[in-house]
Amino acid sequence: MNKGLLVIGIAVIGAAIYFLSNDVGQSLETSGSAPVMAAPEPTVGLIDDARIIAADDEPGNWLSFGRNYGETRFSPLTQINRETVSELGLAWFKDMGTNRALEATPIVVDGIMFFTTSWSRVYAVDARTGETLWSYDPKVPGEWARWACCDVVNRGVAVYKGRVYVGSLDGRLIALDAGTGTEIWQVDTLVDRDRPYTITGAPRVANGKVYIGNGGAEYGVRGYVTAYDAASGEQVWRFYTVPGDPNLPFESPEMEMAAKTWKGGEWWKVGGGGTVWNSIVYDPDFNQLYIGVGNGSPWTR
């Protein structure tokens, strides 16, 4: 039996079982806005588009949300089956020091597991032992919890070319060094901080860009997805999912067309909804992004 594999799982206390090990640096926490420093040549978290496309060639890793660009969430590993599942046991567990929900999908890269806990905190741990290699706390203001529909959760990170990307509950996108947890840059993704936007979804990375949406359609916001340059944090484009005030210039021909189908009432005063709170999938064959939107607002009666 290949002893490199057990299985993965993260519960409320952070239970996990898995793979290989690797040495990385210590925790460093900084703050700033993009760009804040020139990053050294990365040695950890060396994921690129080619590795994610060929994810089946390294089944012992879980390189992206959903495992691959298709987000199939299926492991091709065969060691755990009907005959062997009864032999599984707990390899290690980790108390994450919170009584709030954990909803992150761990990303596993060459023996290091990257995941988030409540309040958008990020951890890198040795996947074999559970030892914390570094952690990062974005220090989300506690009052932001009032905007979170479904607890102060976070669904995980993206790892790409030596960096770890996380969206914070209060609407920031942050890039960290995958080896040390040092902050490289952060940007404010929110178009209006007086509106109850949140981020609980995991970023997606592809083709040199980081893609992030947001939540809050229940409370009256307007949904959109933004692409940022993965290296610098500079905004590349933004796409709104619902039309805004028809008395103002439209952001795109698509929004002008969509506005013709929105009838009755002044929906733009309550945002319009349509937030992309987690469903973002990249198709490398066509270089297209597919997104799923949440409820409209005001809610239909």
List where the protein language model places each region.
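Positively charged n-region of N-terminal signal peptides that target proteins for export
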Residues: M1-G4
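Core hydrophobic alpha-helical membrane-spanning segments
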Residues: L6-F19
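Short loop/turn segments that connect beta-strands within beta-propeller blades
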Residues: D126-T129, K139, D177-T180, D229-S232
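Hydrophobic single-pass membrane-insertion segments
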Residues: Y18-E29
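Active-site cofactor/substrate anionic-group-binding motifs, chiefly glycine-
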Residues: F115, V122, A127-T132, Y136
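Aromatic (tryptophan-biased) beta-strands that constitute blades/sheets of beta-rich domains
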Residues: G32-M96, E131-R146, T182-V191, E234-V242, ...
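Repeat-blade elements of multi-bladed beta-propeller folds
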Residues: W62-G66, A101-R121, R146-R172, T198-R222, ...
